[in-house]
């Protein structure tokens, strides 16, 4: 079975690639590698999430990038919202090492990047203003829904959970789960089969 990116220590041979990408009118330099998600470019789903994300107004707290990979979402949002601290977590150590290097390469200092299998290493009692995730679809529906449902406990009141999922990979199911957990859900936009879905903790 081919190893997927929801793996603590990928065994696939390292084949790093570096490229430049524009996100939210800013230029970024990213290095990615085999054994991490979307190693050749910033994937369309992440780009759509980055471009459509809005920080909730009047909510105090950091932002969490759950399943950050090599860091395009967290790093670009850290550049967009320099007054915010962005915490970026992943289960994949190779991805985390790349995320740290990419933050440094782009001179981003308002980030904390650390290992966590889903919310395992998140500070107990911490409440975020927003959680964003391009979830690890290949890890299976149970993992994806765990990420979405447990987000509720880590959000401040009026904080938001925003995710991107393709329709064919379970967006309608994710929408239903978020409605069930939060009592509200909005499909912010749909583009090329990708849905941006948002819920608010009320």
Q: What is the predicted role of each segment?
A:
Residues 183, 190-202:
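Core SAM-dependent methyltransferase catalytic element
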Residues 132-142:
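Glycine-rich phosphate-binding "P-loop"
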């Amino acid at each position: 079975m081919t190893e997927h990116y929801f793996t603590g220590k990928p065994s696939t041979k390292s084949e790093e690639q570096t490229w430049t990408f524009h996100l939210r009118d800013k230029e970024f330099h990213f290095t990615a590698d085999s054994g991490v998600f979307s190693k050749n470019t910033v994937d369309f789903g992440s780009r759509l999430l980055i471009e459509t994300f809005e920080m909730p107004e009047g909510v105090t707290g950091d932002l969490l990038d759950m399943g950050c990979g090599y860091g395009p979402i967290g790093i670009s949002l850290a550049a967009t919202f320099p007054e915010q601290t962005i915490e970026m977590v992943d289960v994949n150590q190779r991805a985390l090492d790349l995320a740290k290097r990419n933050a440094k390469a782009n001179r981003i200092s308002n980030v904390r990047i650390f290992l966590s299998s889903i919310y395992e290493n998140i500070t107990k009692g911490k409440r975020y203003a927003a959680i964003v995730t391009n979830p690890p679809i290949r890890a299976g529906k149970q993992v994806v829904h765990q990420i979405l449902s447990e987000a509720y406990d880590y959000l401040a009141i009026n904080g938001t959970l925003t995710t991107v999922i393709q329709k064919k990979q379970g967006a309608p199911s994710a929408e239903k789960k978020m409605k069930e957990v939060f009592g509200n859900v909005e499909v912010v936009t749909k583009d090329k089969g990708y849905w941006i879905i948002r819920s608010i903790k009320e």
